[in-house]
Structures are given as C-alpha cells and as structure tokens.
C-alpha cells in the first residue's frame, strides 16, 4: 500500500484537483491522508464527496507548519511506501502504478522520484529510471510532490519548511535522514 500525505492550508480548488487525479489512478491500493490546517473544517465536505471512491483519512490540525503536519500524517499512515503530494499538484493516471512497479522490481531501492511537469509553463524535470539518486542529486531531482520512499522511522525536521523558522529544505533533510 502507498500512503499519500498532504498537509494543506488556504487551498480548496487545488485540493479538489488533487483528489480528482487520485480518484482516476489505475493503481488502487493507496490511502490519502489529508492534514487540514484550515479554520472551520472547510475541506471536510469536499473529502466526503470522494469517500466512496478513495480511502481517505481526514485529520484536522490546529497546529501550523508543513513539516509538523506531514509528521502527523506519517503517524497515521499504514503504507509501506509514503509520498507527500503538495496540495496544489496532481498526478497523471498511471503514476502510482509505475511507481509501485519500480519498487516491486527493485526490492533494494528506498526512493523513487518521478518526472515533474510544471502546469504553468510546461517545463519537465525528468529522472531516468536507470539513474541512481545520490545524496548530492536529491536537491536537483527530489521535490515533495515527486518522491516516493519506503517508510522508515524518519520524520521531517519541524524547524524546516513552510510555516517554520527555516522556510524550506525539509524534503532534502528528510531524504538525507533516510
């Protein structure tokens, strides 16, 4: 199973787009964990609309901070593989199927990074399947919305990321911990 963990604040239509892309996935053995930092449970009804099509855990969090809330999602996750789609991204229909195929064929890998296409300007950041991602390449190829990792005890440093003292760097730090 794959656990997809999204921490969100201040976005509604973007989350709807993400949910729609998840409902269209060809691979179905995944759960979506939405950690909602918004006031007044504004996403609860939207999540309910998708509950019959997706395995969703909706978690309301009073605490603010991307890394902190991703860690909350990790605490609830049941998958052997975890990923952290941003609340403003979406996946092509076969992404999860391709990712799980790589993990099943290559039992010793801990990380799969997919290609990323910028929806605004069409730029693509692509990783070759044969290319190994070393520590030095995580900054070049690994973004929060394109990394899938075998679940470990690793957690995000709550001092890093949106809403924290240091506003970025949480993905690289997390991957280096793995």
Give, region by region, the residue ranges found by the protein language model.
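N-proximal low-complexity "stem/linker" segments adjacent to membrane-targeting elements
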Residues: 1-24
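Short aromatic/hydrophobic "clamp" motif used to bind/position activated sugar donors
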Residues: 82
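Cell-envelope/extracellular polymer assembly enzymes that use nucleotide-activated donors
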Residues: 1-3, 31, 173
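Acidic donor-binding loop at a coil-to-helix junction in glycosyltransferase catalytic cores
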Residues: 163-174
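Conserved donor NDP-sugar-binding/catalytic core segment of glycosyltransferases
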Residues: 94-125
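Acidic donor-binding segment of Leloir-type glycosyltransferases
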Residues: 19-60
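Conserved nucleotide-sugar donor-binding
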Residues: 78-79, 143-158
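Glycine-rich, basic loop-to-helix element that forms the pyrophosphate-binding segment
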Residues: 61-77
């Amino acid at each position: 199973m794959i656990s997809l963990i999204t921490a969100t604040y201040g976005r509604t239509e973007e989350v709807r787009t993400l949910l729609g892309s998840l409902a269209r996935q060809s691979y179905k053995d995944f759960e979506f964990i939405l950690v909602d930092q918004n006031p007044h449970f504004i996403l609860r009804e939207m999540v309910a609309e998708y509950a019959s099509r997706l395995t969703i855990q909706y978690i309301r969090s009073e605490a603010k901070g991307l890394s902190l809330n991703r860690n909350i999602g990790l605490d609830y996750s049941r998958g052997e593989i975890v990923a952290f789609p941003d609340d403003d991204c979406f996946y092509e229909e076969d992404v999860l199927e391709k990712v799980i195929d790589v993990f099943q064929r290559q039992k010793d890998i801990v990380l799969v990074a997919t290609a990323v296409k910028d929806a605004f300007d069409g730029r693509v950041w692509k990783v070759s399947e044969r290319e190994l991602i070393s520590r030095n390449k995580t900054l070049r190829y690994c973004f929060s919305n394109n990394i899938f990792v075998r679940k470990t005890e690793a957690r995000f440093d709550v001092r890093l990321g949106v809403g924290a003292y240091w506003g970025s760097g949480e993905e690289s730090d997390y991957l280096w911990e793995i």
